[in-house]
Amino acid sequence: MGRQKTKVPEEPQDRLDTSLDPYPDTNYLAPCNKETVMVTLYGATNLPTCKDSSEPWPYVVVKTTSEEANNHSPQARTSVTSEPTRAPIWGDTVNVEIQAEDTGREDVTLKVMDSNKKEELVSYEIPIKYLRAFHPYHFELKKNEKEDEATAKTRLYATVVRKGSLLPRYIGYDHTALEVFLRGVNEPLVNNPSPMVVIARVVPSYTEFKARKARQDPASVGLPLTQVSFPISSPMTFDVPRVSQNGCPQLSKPGGPPEQPLWNQSFLFLGRDGATSFSEDTALVLEYYPSASMKSSEPWTLNQPLGVSVLPLKSHLYRKMLTGKGLKGLQVERLPIFDTNLKTINGEAPSVNLAFQLLSSERPENFLTPNNSKTLPTLNPKILDENLGAIRESWSVSSLDSSQEAEELQPRDVEMNNYRRAMQKMAEDILALRKQANILEEENRMLRSHLTQQSIEEEQNRAEEENLAVSMKQRLLLNELDMKRLRDRVQHLQNELIRKNDREKELLLLYQAQQPQAAQLRRYQDKLQKMKGLEDTVRHQEKVIEKMEQILEERLHERKEPAPSNRPQGKPIMDAFAPQASGIPLGPAGENLAMDLYSMLLAENTRLRTELEKNRQQSAPIILQQQALPVDPGELGAGGDLAERLQDTNGPGHSKYTETMPAQDFLGGTSDKFSLLAKLEQAQSRILSLENQLEESARHWAREKQNLAIRLQEQQHGFGQSPNSIIVDQPHFARSQGSTTPRQNLKDEGYPGNIERPLQTHLTPGTRDIRHHLR
């Protein structure tokens, strides 16, 4: 299994002694939804030299194809050898995690790199999808001679295990795996020169395995390697048989110290390999090899073991494991090592201490450790002796001949062994000192290079700091200027915002103040239209008056003519105008008074026309068209002849009969004069009152028109009234509801009804009487 490295620094570190690690990694499962590829790099042979023909300082980088495509910094790498060599030995274990759904398209790339020149010496790509989960592959990787002649002789030795998040479960098996925890040798050894490695396997038939081992079957001797040539020609290279008669051998890390090796390492054997099928011939086989053989030119030629330990896995052991509480396991305190020359300080054969348990879950939570393995029930030594009886006899018979020969050569061999041991120890000390000297020289060289590089970096950093300080000062000054400019800008925007808000408030107040003014303006316009209609009504009444005057003058002019001959004799012509009706006495004085009144009436009439014309010329500049008020034909006389005559009128002041005529021409007789004078006096009084009202109304209307015109011009030129101004002296005109005649509009405006009534009561009755009299 070896030492696991989960986080590697930027520069590879020197190789550490894995035998000194007291806490090995016992995590056999990958995280959920992921898979882990564990790669143990043992060593390499015949590595190519660098481009400058110098020997490399090799180390191995392990990454996936996706990491290599994305140029990610490699996190899984081994240590660097202590000296330049073409046959390095590492013994490091690295892990690479990938997503479970990406295993079908991911490859694991092993690159041997040179530490000094960062050159790639050789690389191999192993498809993950071809690897069987939880099966230990012991690879001998090489290149095809046709592909690359420079690396054709290079060999890389590694163990690759693909781990999933769950242990596989197969039909017919109650348990998923058997875990074996090997602690170490119980007593110190006296003749062990180097650390030891252990090859552990579970064989379904120990008898057949021993026979194959005696025949020197390559699959049962040492650690069988799977040779893989790149590029890979067929996926059958990674094929694994369903059940192997030789088991699935697993290699431990080197156990030290040599006097009493200690491993504290677990081995996991799956149920699909028959490890959980306890039978009479199933056995756990542990083979011990010296780790010194790994330093030769062919490091994996583990042919002759130092000893063998065998634990029969019979059915009563299975039942014994199930009866325990907690973990389903047992511990064996003294499992002997057979067929060995190793001796303890007591002169006895050594023994090892181990523990094992059955795993039933696909994702177990508790694996064996140095602490919890001591809590397992201990296997009874008597039962162990019974199980090992036949095995001990078989090993003793085979070793009897060798023991007799050893007794003959024992005195001389002891001396030779002592001499060899002393020479070997001296050689090991010399090699250790040389290795330590090389390490110190390398450290000194690295320290000198680091010191030189650090001094150069300090000078560069000092210059960069000075430049950075200058640039920071400039940036600070620019930032201060920008801050000041932005502060002024913010102040300006705040002032502008305040002015905008004040202006908005003013406009809002002005809008609120103009709302009643707009309504008032609309009322003024309605008032102008109504005033225009009233003026049209007045003009129409003037036309009526003029027409009546013309008719009156015409009738008076006709009276100057002699009476018709068919008129009855002795009857006055003006019976209707009797003195009793007029109330004025007859005589010369009455005639003069009537003439004076009529003259005054004509003069006043002329003056009123002039005044009306003047007021008309001084009216408002804005003239709104208004439909003239209709004239009731009944008011102008029966038969409508007066209305027909009024249609021929050209307007006020344009009557054809407005000339002043002598009084004697109009009064032909005494009775007629008095009657007409009475009527004229009555009409005179009525006309005077009407003219006074018309004059007052015309003046009032002229003033209102002028004020409205001035205000309209002010509104058009922008001289609007302030919101606090108060409009006074503006009469209110009520709107007409449900009536459209001008006469009803005059009544609805609030004017006194006698403005229209005199035009009817003062003019219409007299006009009717005159027309009736003239007829």
UniProtKB/Swiss-Prot annotation:
InterPro entries: C2_dom, C2_domain_sf, CCD33. Signal peptide: none annotated. SUPFAM superfamilies: C2 domain (Calcium/lipid-binding domain, CaLB). The keyword Coiled coil applies. SMART domains: C2 (SM00239). Keywords: Coiled coil. Residues 1-23, 68-87, 735-775 are annotated as: Disordered. One of its GO terms (cellular component) is peroxisome. Residues 71-84 have a biased composition (Polar residues). Residues 7-18 have a biased composition (Basic and acidic residues). This is Coiled-coil domain-containing protein 33. The gene is Ccdc33.
